[in-house]
Amino acid sequence: MAEKFESLMNIHGFDLGSRYMDLKPLGCGGNGLVFSAVDNDCDKRVAIKKIVLTDPQSVKHALREIKIIRRLDHDNIVKVFEILGPSGSQLTDDVGSLTELNSVYIVQEYMETDLANVLEQGPLLEEHARLFMYQLLRGLKYIHSANVLHRDLKPANLFINTEDLVLKIGDFGLARIMDPHYSHKGHLSEGLVTKWYRSPRLLLSPNNYTKAIDMWAAGCIFAEMLTGKTLFAGAHELEQMQLILESIPVVHEEDRQELLSVIPVYIRNDMTEPHKPLTQLLPGISREALDFLEQILTFSPMDRLTAEEALSHPYMSIYSFPMDEPISSHPFHIEDEVDDILLMDETHSHIYNWERYHDCQFSEHDWPVHNNFDIDEVQLDPRALSDVTDEEEVQVDPRKYLDGDREKYLEDPAFDTNYSTEPCWQYSDHHENKYCDLECGHTCNYKTRSSSYLDNLVWRESEVNHYYEPKLIIDLSNWKEQSKEKSDKKGKSKCERNGLVKAQIALEEASQQLAGKEREKNQGFDFDSFIAGTIQLSSQHEPTDVVDKLNDLNSSVSQLELKSLISKSVSQEKQEKGMANLAQLEALYQSSWDSQFVNGGEDCFFINQFCEVRKDEQVEKENTYTSYLDKFFSRKEDTEMLETEPVEDGKLGERGHEEGFLNNSGEFLFNKQLESIGIPQFHSPVGSPLKSIQATLTPSAMKSSPQIPHQTYSSILKHLN
């Protein structure tokens, strides 16, 4: 166990000393690897997130996350226990000490699962979805009151304990502080929210957004809980916007004009009536739930409900209790930002670039949309910053095929292919988003030196080239079809390469062969070969010893039936099979049986009626064979056990001439004269002729089997012996 633990620690570089044991990987967070481990001090399982500090940018993100999660304390937020350095060392409160470390460990609360795993099993009941949505809004109300944006809300970052149905928000690796008194335009990172949960404003202005982006993501998550599938699952940002416009109405004219300047091919004169409203995307939900969702998924962030307003909606009235929905008592402000601390130089801080509003009462919705460029110059870069890395999901930017990289983007050394990216953060005119693009280029499946989405695009002739030009639309359509064909071909090749179909067929054949061998092993008697052998033997001369054995066997059977304490030598199943074959034997000689009665009091019945039971089943299963002779014939027992009482002999004498009667136990005692069915009288060893065959039958469900000619009885005995 110790060797396995040390190996796992060495592979993933976990260095926490001997305090934490039983490491198990959980996944990757926004900026680190997450493991679960058992804390030996308290014997409790915790989640540990490792953040590698390789450059100033990673240090800044780590410090930002640590500052945020240390201050956030809420029932619906994953709790953080402590922050550790290498070898499990305790970190000081001096945030500048992070610059001297190569890694940091965040020990936090362990949760059973996440919402993404739950939704893989299918949609939730509306009541469960409403309960989880209430807890999500309750946590968002606290987070936003602390002037924090999560910026990466998705089902995988919402953790759940299934026992008490408690939901908690986690993974603040992409969260940041945003003081509403300051304009953060141009200083916000781009494309951080997972593509399927990005709001329309985030798609149009990726570096100018507000807390409303978290509310849009929450609405998409609520719809996903109700349907079990992603609400807007676009392959790239252009398709993502198209899917949104098909279901979300555009009410304000200024929003429609902005869209008209970006993607006019999708814009109509009247955008208030979408083609596929939410009622079609979410059939079966209640009217209150639909109204609640429509007020969250609005195109304009100014019309969107805040977390506090959503909690006051009538749909949440059964859970909402404002006195139990706390807000942060110590919110973050502009001085809590970390850029100046990390860069260790006041000249490198971006605080001096921020503009202080004269009226600090402005809300987040009152920020100007555009500041440095006209609205007509807005371009939409159809990049898909997907979390997956498969070749099928890689999105191609049509502009990459144009000549001259430097003609497409700003003349800035940060985007020069020959320019080293490492020292770029030292320049005073460096923008943090450019370095972020360079750093995460390998994860977003795109060119490593793409510029900002909208405001940093400069085209060759300094003219606005909208995304509705024919060549670009055709390129995007062709790419989509080709990627679909490639996906189909690749899926087939993988299936053939992995041998899934062949393996499945081989497994089925092996199962069938094993079942066949098992049947051959368990079957007690092959009736086909037996019949063939008996027919061949029937033509041979009957030896004397066989006749003697038949007489002895007949006598033994008649005496065994009179001994009530002797257990039956065959199972109930063989008795049923014997009854069926006897019924067929009687049917063969129907003429001699038609007038025979069974004397059994009130329970008597015609024996020909008894033999016709399940006759229809004989037609359906005429090829079914059973070994019924085990019932009619058994070996002779020890003479000491065959003694009978005189009373029973008397009864037997009284009924000796009867062909059949019912005893008290419901069994049918059969006594058939051999001469009536054409079997010759054999002589017993004592010289007395054998004139009858006796057997015991139990009325029950019978199965049919082929008839055997009476001439083969002696050969059958030979086979049994």
Curated annotation (Swiss-Prot):
Its main location: cytoplasm. Residues 701-715 have a biased composition (Polar residues). Its EC number is 2.7.11.24. Gene3D superfamilies: Phosphorylase Kinase, domain 1, Transferase(Phosphotransferase) domain 1. A motif (SEG motif) lies at residues 189-191. It is found in: Cytoplasm; Nucleus. This is Mitogen-activated protein kinase 6. Phosphorylated at Ser-189 by PAK1, PAK2 and PAK3 resulting in catalytic activation. Phosphorylated by MAPKAPK5 at other sites. Ubiquitination at Met-1 leads to degradation by the proteasome pathway. Pfam families: Pkinase. It catalyses: L-seryl-[protein] + ATP = O-phospho-L-seryl-[protein] + ADP + H(+); L-threonyl-[protein] + ATP = O-phospho-L-threonyl-[protein] + ADP + H(+). Its cofactor is Mg(2+). Residues 701-721 are annotated as: Disordered. Atypical MAPK protein. Phosphorylates microtubule-associated protein 2 (MAP2) and MAPKAPK5. The precise role of the complex formed with MAPKAPK5 is still unclear, but the complex follows a complex set of phosphorylation events: upon interaction with atypical MAPKAPK5, ERK3/MAPK6 is phosphorylated at Ser-189 and then mediates phosphorylation and activation of MAPKAPK5, which in turn phosphorylates ERK3/MAPK6. May promote entry in the cell cycle. There is a cross-link at M1 (Peptide (Met-Gly) (interchain with G-Cter in ubiquitin)). CDD domains: STKc_MAPK4_6. Heterodimer with ERK4/MAPK4. Interacts with (via FRIEDE motif) MAPKAPK5. Interacts with UBE3A; this interaction may be indirect and mediated by HERC2, possibly via HERC2 interaction with NEURL4. A motif (FRIEDE motif) lies at residues 332-337. Keywords: ATP-binding, Cell cycle, Cytoplasm, Kinase, Nucleotide-binding, Nucleus, Phosphoprotein, Serine/threonine-protein kinase, Transferase, Ubl conjugation. PROSITE patterns: PROTEIN_KINASE_ATP, PROTEIN_KINASE_DOM, PROTEIN_KINASE_ST. Belongs to the protein kinase superfamily. CMGC Ser/Thr protein kinase family. MAP kinase subfamily. GO terms for cellular component: cytoplasm; cytosol; nucleus; protein-containing complex; septin cytoskeleton. The gene is MAPK6. The modification Phosphoserine is found at S189, S386, S452, S556, S558, S665, S684. In contrast to classical MAPKs, the TXY motif within the activation loop is replaced by the SEG motif, whose phosphorylation activates the MAP kinases.
